[in-house]
Amino acid sequence: NSPKEIADKTFLYLHTSYPEKGGWDIEEGILSNNLSGKVLCTYVCRGCSHWSPSKYRGPIKRCQKCGQRSAFMPNVGHGLSIEELIKVYNLFDLYVQYAICEGFGMPQVEAACCGVPVAAVNYSAMEDVVKHTNGYPIKVQKMFRELNTNAERAYPSNEHLAEIIETHFSKDEKFREQKSKDVRQGT
């Protein structure tokens, strides 16, 4: 697979939405960067509780099951069951935790328990999680001090993540299946 072929098959999957005052505006970021065709989301219906993955259709979309315009991205107040969450993780070929810092991140461990290889920034608690899940550590590009918290944070290397993705998906299916087994057994 060439880098272009890999990029054409690569999607960002957003499972949850955490709206916060002064925080990220997910819709604005997706639309302003012309990414709506490359972003997949989990939507769950307020009416019938049916969930499904879908290309990004805005904060609310029509439910595939009941037809009502009431499906939204799950959040801490209205999420999925453990069994449904396992099905979401099993949609992934690679879980990427691309954060400037992170406490102990359950999503990384959950993904690894489902046999999904993890790539995470080699900093903070992510460093230990990626090490113990036989994952891919993403190099830190540079450190900075966050003004609001006065804490040190890490900018991940975009180039190194691209190399990880290219390397992982350039391997044959047999290698990726074995990697999945190794990740699951090591978690």
Report the location of each language-model feature.
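Conserved sugar-transfer catalytic core signal across GT-A, GT-B, and GT-C glycosyltransferases
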Residues: E84-L85, P107, C114
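Nucleotide-activated donor-binding/catalytic signature segment of Leloir-type glycosyltransferases, i.e.
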Residues: G23-K87
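Short hydrophobic signal-anchor/transmembrane segments that target glycosyltransferases
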Residues: N1-A7
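A short, well-ordered alpha-helix in the C-terminal region of glycosyltransferases
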Residues: T167, K174-T187
